[in-house]
Amino acid sequence: MGLTLIDAGVLIGFLDRTDAHHAASYDALTGALDRNDRIVLPASAYGEALVGPSRRGSKAVTVVEQLVERVPIEIEPLSQAIARTAAMIRAKHRSIRLPDALVIATAKELDADLLVTTDHGWPTRAKLGLRATITRL
């Protein structure tokens, strides 16, 4: 049993069957469940994933909330340590936006085994100083 951390794109892809990342997101989440991994989503990424459903209304938001509860996906709050690590990542890697730095920092602070993202622009795990394997969908 390990810890799989997902970014917003994975949850968005899982929820939207028309999304280019749907099948890969589905496989990533079911794989984590099959391994009995804890699945964690940073609170910042959860907020990002709720933007589209929020535009569609409260019922769409409820669908996401129910999925998160059923899977279950743990929502990791933004802590001072995560914020500090994200700032250091952002300062060192100028191409990484703050939302992505928060996801990476959460993986680092939680010592995740696997970080699943739809972003292909991130530096390697070695350059990021991560123990986690990065899976890019």
Language model feature labels by segment:
Residues 1-41, 53-66:
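Short, well-structured N-terminal submotif of metal-dependent ribonuclease cores
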Residues 35-39, 72-74, 110-114:
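Short active-site oxyanion
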Residues 56-60, 93-94, 132-135:
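Short, hinge-like loop/turn segments at secondary-structure boundaries
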Residues 6, 40-41, 77, 98, ...:
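Short beta-strand scaffold positions
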Residues 17, 44, 72-93:
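Acidic catalytic patch
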Residues 1-3, 104-137:
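Acidic, PIN/NYN-like endoribonuclease modules and their adjacent C-terminal/linker elements
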Residues 10, 45, 82, 102-103, ...:
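Alpha-helix capping/helix-boundary segments
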